[in-house]
Amino acid sequence: MSSIKKIEKARELINKNHKIFKCPVCGGSMYLKRENSLACGSGHSFDLSKKGYLNLLTSGRAPVYSKDLFESRRKVCEAGFYDPLIEALTEIIAKYSGSSPKTGIAVLDAGCGEGSHLTGISQRMNELHPGRAEQNTVAGKNVFTGIDISKDSIQIAARGEPDIIWCVSDLSSLPFRDGSFDVVLNILSPANYGEFKRILSRRGMLVKVVPGERYLAEIREAVGGGEKAGGSKTESYSNERVVQYFEERMEVVDILDIGYQFHVEEQLLPHLIRMTPLTWGKDADGLLSSRGMSEITVDLTVLTGQNK
């Protein structure tokens, strides 16, 4: 899709859904101006990129992850590494959607990275509900929005999926009005429960994905931490505190464990290594290639909670 078509599509989606936004500076209502910018009544204005995304970041905070990490994660996702997770999340959202009196729901992926997870979910939701394939409209259609603090990651996300609203934003102060979303996804990303609860509808759902004890165990072992082949551990990981924190703040509906082995083709291995912070500052390329690694463990916990 050309840059002109991307910005036109993004403009259409944002214009139809401008009421979900609040000004990240003053909190005022926002509207889309003719010159492709989202503005409030006080004159604060945020440009819509010709690449099809909004930059609503007001602070100078530098993103933690590099563009290379997100490019690699996109390739890993395209290879099907997270497909069982995407299927499970789609099922959770579809179940919620089916019980909702609305004909369409609003979904936010908070900390969406390069957008692979949300893109996969939106595509599968359209397959389940063909009548809702025209997304991001006010009148009864599904609305999918992805945000991340990394401009690089959002640029990558906007390359692939024109029917999702993509925004650069900070989780510490989300640029959305109270009660704007029915479902908030938080996938392998830091959380801000106060903001999530604020932007969720009265009985909205927070779906948080956290790593399990054996997530990427082979990589953790290779770089000096995690479970060894014989079962002993050098440095174990537990998500117990994260789960407890979730349970204290949300009305827990379900806890789902997802575990499987993924066969890694040789050409995918460098991208798998680069997509995780576990390998920062490590000679992981050499370590993994020397061990002839071909199977990687995926161990995830999906926490589903309702807004209290």
Explain the meaning of each model-derived region.
Residues 17-18, 258-308:
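Conserved Class I S-adenosyl-L-methionine
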Residues 204-214:
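Conserved beta-strand signature within the Rossmann-like core of class I S-adenosyl-L-methionine
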Residues 162-174:
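Conserved SAM-binding strand-loop segment of SAM-dependent methyltransferases
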Residues 2-63:
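N-terminal auxiliary segments of SAM/dcSAM-dependent transferases
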Residues 172-183:
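A short acidic, Gly/Pro-enriched loop at the edge of an enzyme's catalytic core
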Residues 11, 63-88, 92, 96:
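Class I SAM-dependent methyltransferase Rossmann-like catalytic core
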Residues 102-113:
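Conserved class I S-adenosyl-L-methionine
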Residues 114-132, 136-138:
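Conserved SAM-binding loop of SAM-dependent methyltransferases across substrates and taxa
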